[in-house]
Design a protein with these regions (language model features):
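Short hydrophobic core segments
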Residues: 45, 59, 71-84, 119-122, ...
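Conserved SAM/SAH-binding loop
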Residues: 42-46, 63-65, 106-109, 165-166, ...
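A Rossmann-like FAD-binding core segment of flavoenzymes
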Residues: 36, 47, 133-212, 225, ...
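Feature captures the FAD/FMN-dependent oxidoreductase FAD-binding
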Residues: 5-76, 81
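Conserved N-terminal glycine-rich FAD pyrophosphate-binding loop of Rossmann-like flavoproteins
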Residues: 1
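C-terminal, flexible cofactor-proximal segment of oxidoreductases
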Residues: 228-376
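FAD-site-proximal beta/loop scaffold in flavoenzymes
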Residues: 101, 107-110, 190-239
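Glycine-rich dinucleotide-binding loop and its adjacent helix/turn
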Residues: 18, 22-25, 76-138, 144-145, ...
Length: 376
């Protein structure tokens, strides 16, 4: 809430910026906060050990520039590596003999490679939804989404469909659990990620699926068995930057002694309460309300700048509604910022016609001219 898109770009932008634009915004926030001076670059955390007697962490580090391994001692350890970097790659019989493109959504950088191809997406969450419509937009011959438990259930355009889980491949032919089969040119595994912490011993590792409230984390970030070990950003997310900020402020106040933690039993009771609330969620709107209450709970314990979280929740629910109503056109919608009160600008080109996601193109003032389109 302390660095708006309006401030960074000097004007309102549209509500669905591509990754290059988000990256530029993040770089701007890094420059404004001058945080780089606190970061030790070209350094890898090799291993961590906890000393029960001293209540400290021994961290073994590799200096990649000087080819040097060294050790440092810390009172607190904050794990903020995220959980969207280690792809979960399930095995399907015959996949090793599939002759076409196989990738994980983690490595997807553009759907133009799928033009005129039959594309199979395995998984039924945001990645499958997004890569599916991107592939449709860029001219895929067909897009098939294979789900394990339940379909996304969108009103897909002609050429897109959902089928039950893939069972096996025979060459380029995929067989599904409903008895159907189809040939494919490309497969994208939209099968999620693993929480992976190879630098931590087993007893310090967070072990959880992707969920709104990981087990064993008090307030969603304090490792209950060892409260000077903190995990940031390990939840499934509706809120992103604001939630990360709220967690960081909470962690800061713990380390500075401003927040006094209850004992382990009390912390465990609080975890159970939040997990019960999470389990009671019946739909996406419930999940939005749950995470809104969670962020409110964090902010109430610190001096993080307050803002209207209920209004943010309304926007999330409108976004969900807009997607359900038209999966191909919802990105053309604009919303009013809760932080600045300004309404987003409508993008100069409707999403289905926009084939260029570069930073320069996004911030240009108008649609491409006919000759420019012909040269793409």
């Amino acid at each position: 809430s302390d660095y708006s898109f309006d401030e960074h770009f000097g004007k309102p932008i549209s509500s669905y910026p591509p990754r290059s634009v988000l990256f530029d915004y993040i770089q701007g926030r890094v420059r404004k906060s001058d945080v780089r001076k606190y970061i030790r670059f070209n350094t890898t955390t090799r291993w961590v050990e906890y000393n029960e007697e001293t209540k400290q962490f021994k961290v073994i580090l590799d200096d990649l520039v000087n080819n040097r391994t060294y050790t440092e001692i810390f009172d607190y350890l904050v794990v903020a590596t995220g959980h969207f970097s280690t792809p979960n790659m399930p095995y399907f019989e015959g996949v090793q003999d599939f002759p076409g493109i196989i990738m994980h959504a983690h490595d997807f950088r553009g759907a133009d490679q799928f033009k005129d191809k039959d594309v199979l997406l395995i998984g039924s969450s945001y990645s499958a939804e997004d890569i599916g419509v991107q592939s449709y937009k860029h001219g895929a011959k067909s897009v098939t989404i294979s789900y394990r438990s339940q379909p996304l259930g969108m009103d897909w355009p002609e050429g897109m469909k959902e089928v039950p889980l893939l069972e096996k491949f025979e060459g380029d032919l995929g067989y599904f659990s409903d008895g159907t089969s189809q040939r494919f040119d490309a497969v994208v595994m939209c099968t999620g990620y693993q929480h992976k912490f190879p630098f931590l011993p087993d007893e310090l590792r967070l072990k959880t699926a992707n969920c709104l409230y990981p087990e064993n984390l008090y307030k969603g970030l304090v490792f209950n068995k060892l409260p000077n070990l903190l995990y940031l950003g390990m939840q499934d997310q509706y809120y992103t930057f604001n939630m990360f900020d709220a967690q960081a402020w909470f962690a800061r106040d713990i380390m500075q002694g401003k927040i006094k933690l209850p004992n382990e039993e009390q912390r465990n009771d609080d975890i159970k309460l939040w997990m019960e609330l999470s389990a009671a969620n019946k739909n996406h709107d419930d999940e939005v309300d749950f995470q809104t209450d969670y962020v409110k709970d964090l902010i109430a314990a610190t001096n993080y700048p307050s803002f209207d979280l209920d209004a943010v929740a309304v926007l999330f629910k409108q976004w969900l509604k807009d997607k359900d109503e038209n999966i191909l056109e919802y990105r053309d919608k604009t919303y009013t910022s809760v932080i600045t009160g300004t309404k987003a600008e409508k993008h100069h080109t409707v999403w289905l016609d926009e084939m260029d996601d570069t930073f320069e193109r996004f911030l240009s003032i108008g649609p491409k001219k006919e000759k420019e389109v012909e040269t793409l």
